[in-house]
């Protein structure tokens, strides 16, 4: 794993989040940008930009997660934590766990309300970051991983499935009316829309939204950006400056 590999991921993500990766009529600029960390949370310079390597030999099952929770939960309001190891439950991202008790609602997410961000003490990697497997990291700059960034900032999948437990509300599953809801089917770029209105037309399209699985993963919509901005403003652990 090299700085160059990670920089490729950063460069792609920044183009997607700025709406400049592809000529997409619905893509917008989120004003969110990522960069590789050069210092740790104590202000010490990292030997390799973007990388904090930890040698653990051959850890027992569960030891890696315990070590991360105790030593490697860097301030999530300053640093996007991404851990790479095959011992921590695969490639995954987690929705925000907390929200300020100020009347703000992020539909579809179940969060604990707190009066201030200072009340929150993060104790688990699942509250603050993203996990990747060793094998997955080597394709990180080829696209698709923006899905995990979107999940981290409160976006929801755009697929309808009777098995997901996510309700179909007002013709939508992700609470963003400017995204297509597609029907679960074969793993492919080509998708078709889903509706509970049997008279509604079916639209066939090549998917490009970051929350479409098996997508070109090149764009965000306006309402998705509004949702992420709401999360950044109100959800401790996601409150970047």
Residue ranges and their predicted role:
Residues 65-160:
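Active-site-proximal segment of zinc-dependent metalloprotease catalytic domains
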Residues 215-241:
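Pan-zinc metallopeptidase signature
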Residues 24-27, 121-124, 202-203:
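Short, conserved catalytic or adaptor-binding loops enriched in Gly and charged residues
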Residues 4-11, 15, 143, 147-151, ...:
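Solvent-exposed, polar/charged alpha-helical surfaces in well-ordered, non-transmembrane soluble domains
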Residues 128-220:
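The catalytic-center signature of Zn2+-dependent metalloproteases
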Residues 30, 76-78, 126-128, 206-207, ...:
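Residues that flank catalytic or metal-binding motifs in active/ligand-binding sites
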Residues 1-78, 86, 233-240:
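Propeptide-to-catalytic entry region of secreted or membrane-anchored zinc metalloproteases
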